[in-house]
Amino acid sequence: VFHAVYAYRNPDGGFGHGMEPDTASPESQPLFSIMALETLDEVGYLTKEIILKDFMPYFENITTEKGGIPWMFRPKSTYPCEEHFKTVKEWSALSTTAPLLGILEKYELDIPWMKKAEQFVWSEFERIQDKHIFCYLCVPRWLTFLEYTKSRARANKTINDLKNWI
């Protein structure tokens, strides 16, 4: 599984090459990189060293001023992709930043990047209360963060808020 996932890895440390079937673009994408991280975690091949050495340099490099990582970047190549990827907004996203933070917490990592990212995630949970869920995969990714964050009282309140919201 490890080698199958890493076949999608690019020299910049991100993952691309159509890892998600809606685009065949070889370019690294934040979402694909999160998918790779989640897959390695799920099958038991993820370690602190892999997170810090192979994943975090890419994520730190694409972090926005707000402290989060984008969901996707518009493909720069002419490879086939669904229309929604051609018009994607390249701003920080809860659905990519929250699971990354959750995995960092799960593996008991504490790196400087996490502070601003955590502020971004909590502010997004506040902001989304009047929005709609546009992706059925978003909520489970948010729960990764809420399950592992050290801020238990705040996480429990947010989970209850999400239950009411959904």
Where on the chain are the PLM-derived regions?
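Preference for long, amphipathic alpha-helical scaffolds in soluble/luminal domains
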Residues: 1-166
